[in-house]
Amino acid sequence: MTDRHAGHVKFDNVGLRYGTDPEVLSNLSFTLYPGSFYFLTGASGAGKTSLLKLLYLAQRPSRGAIRMFGQDLITMPRERLPDLRRRLGVVFQNFRLVPHLSAFDNVALPLRLAGADEKRVVKAVAEMLDWVGLTHRAHAIPATLSGGEQQRVAIARAVIARPRMLIADEPTGNVDPEMALKLLRLFEALNNRVGTTVVVATHDVHLLKKVPDSLIMRLNKGQLSDPTGALRYPPRPATAGESGA
């Protein structure tokens, strides 16, 4: 079996509790496969944010095992976490932009930190700002941007480096329906063309049918509902873009 088919992320009987409180996540076992698109849904308090924290390496489980990109997260030394995090793109619900940098420079950060050629940076950022409809705001600092504009900058920054996995927490919460669909198409393009695994947490039930072949992960009181077993098997063949993932 190839590493692709083994999955980017595998949870095995994972539980999470904070301190001595009852578990907020219980007995989670699933696999996120390379090049697949997932929606994470559930009522408020179902555990979505806690699950996302495990996925973007902000939290370790209280029990169980997690493997990501072939690495055992339980036994892996903490000093190796930054390298693993560089393979992730994360859009936080409470995102933060660098206040003294322009929209352009905020989006450029991941590429510049990776040492990318400046010509490539300028071209990539210009394309990304055009995609999210912010070309005219490229030189604006965050304080002068609306909440929705800031969110689009945060999304552009998260996807510009073509991460192996994109994790987005309520990414369309502050934008109008037209822009929400456009952002979803951006995630879909990243998924289809590059092979990025995408996980979008959302309360918007209207989004769930907008991406063909997407899988829905439903959390209920910290447990995952997967009656069809879809989260245990590859949903479709790997795409050409995954070969470099």
Task: For the regions a language model picked out, list residue spans one by one.
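Helix-to-loop junction immediately C-terminal to a conserved catalytic motif
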Residues: 56
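Conserved ABC transporter NBD signature motif
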Residues: 64-72
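ABC ATPase NBD coupling module
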Residues: 73-89
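Short coil-to-helix segment of the ABC ATPase nucleotide-binding domain corresponding to the Q-loop/switch region
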Residues: 101-109
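Conserved ABC ATPase signature
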Residues: 141-145, 149-151
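Conserved catalytic motifs of ABC-family nucleotide-binding domains
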Residues: 162
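Catalytic Walker B motif of ABC-type/P-loop ATPase nucleotide-binding domains
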Residues: 166-169
